[in-house]
Amino acid sequence: MSNTFEDRIGRAQRKTSESDISVSINLDGSGKTDISTGLPFFDHMLTALGAHGSFDLEVKAVGDVEIDAHHTVEDTGIVLGQALGEALGTKAGIRRFGDAFIPMDECLAHAAVDVSGRPYYVGTGEPDAMVHTVIGGHYATVINQHFFETLALNARIALHVRCLYGRDPHHITEAEYKAVARALRAAVERDERVTGIPSTKGAL
């Protein structure tokens, strides 16, 4: 598949005994989304990720949600990361770095991205309540960290996500997803001043 700026599209699929997931992402889209995971709150978060990243994002996931949401959420992070990595291609001409602060009522979240080819994840600052809160009867907010970590490792990016402050687990989760979306949008954006790979090593 070509990975020019006119065709920065990535697709990935993964099928296991726990889930069957397919993802398509267009980095140069307009924020159109088509999301179906069987988990309404997770659908809401992925819709926000696509919309605020200005990515055209399609996610189809069938998982053992009757047992737990964990497998579907984490495996979606894996497949989305793989699709994102494919869409990035050689990474020529991109800004490479991006970050964003996102408020949601009482909460403030920050995300920073380096499209480095060196996968790493750091998540910090979430209040203790996030460990045992369940949103909508199906989305345990402790899964946030697993999703972002698997996304980062499979996209081969460095991703840092911070909750600076906040009380409502819904607000914290949504602010984090939106911060990641905006940081990714900035990092993958084309920069006319960058004529090749944005690294002094000549490769990412």
Swiss-Prot record:
GO terms for biological process: L-histidine biosynthetic process. This is Imidazoleglycerol-phosphate dehydratase. CDD domains: IGPD. It is found in: Cytoplasm. It comes from Corynebacterium urealyticum (strain ATCC 43042 / DSM 7109). Keywords: Amino-acid biosynthesis, Cytoplasm, Histidine biosynthesis, Lyase. One of its GO terms (cellular component) is cytoplasm. HAMAP family: HisB (MF_00076). Belongs to the imidazoleglycerol-phosphate dehydratase family. It is an enzyme of class 4 (lyase). The gene is hisB. One of its GO terms (molecular function) is imidazoleglycerol-phosphate dehydratase activity. Its EC number is 4.2.1.19.
